[in-house]
Amino acid sequence: MQGLLFLFCGEVFEAETVIVAAGYESRYITRTVGIDIPMTRYFEEALVTEMQPHMFDIMLGTADADFYGHQSQHGSFVFGSDSGLEESIDKSFDDLRTTSITASAGCRAIMGYIPKLADAKIVRTWGGWCDLCFDGVPVIDRVDEVPGLILACGFTGHGFGTAPAVGLMLSQMVAGED
């Protein structure tokens, strides 16, 4: 079998096709075969409020990317936001957590558009790194220099929303239907 070798949990596997879809870590993984994906990572946060009276059914977002989110069917709001503190974050540190400082930056942006949420209690927050290609366009393609290698990365935090379509596209690529 001619294909790619890869290591997982100390074991070596061989496959005709390997998909690298590991967010920002895709850059690290592909460097092992001489491919450098022009990308970076940035920190995004999310929060959930306590239940609120029904306000609207649409997804919200701002052109400046201050925040995005929606009201769930049971009434809580789920928002993602940029803390605005990106420059002060140590990008070598992987165990980032939201704090009262970073979460409040996102809350101020949200309250600027939805003042009725000023007194809403936040019940949960979390954050994590998102991958971003320098041109803002995700990579979903074969790598000519490494036959059998397919990349799917650089989704700028939109991976969950695009996952069904991307999964179908990747399965078609693996099956040779692209």
Set out the residue ranges of the language-model regions:
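A conserved short coil-to-beta-strand element within the FAD-binding core of flavoproteins
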Residues: 1-4
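Glycine-centered tight beta-turn/hairpin loop motif at sheet-sheet or coil-to-beta transitions
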Residues: 8-10, 64
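Central helical "cap/lid" subdomain
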Residues: 11-56
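Alpha-helix/helix-capping structural signal
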Residues: 24-25, 108, 165
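A short alpha-helix-loop-beta-strand transition element characteristic
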Residues: 37-39, 119, 177-178
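Active-site lid/adjacent beta-loop-alpha segment flanking the redox-cofactor pocket in flavoenzymes
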Residues: 51-149
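C-terminal lid/capping helical subdomain adjacent to the catalytic/cofactor pocket in oxidative enzymes
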Residues: 144-178
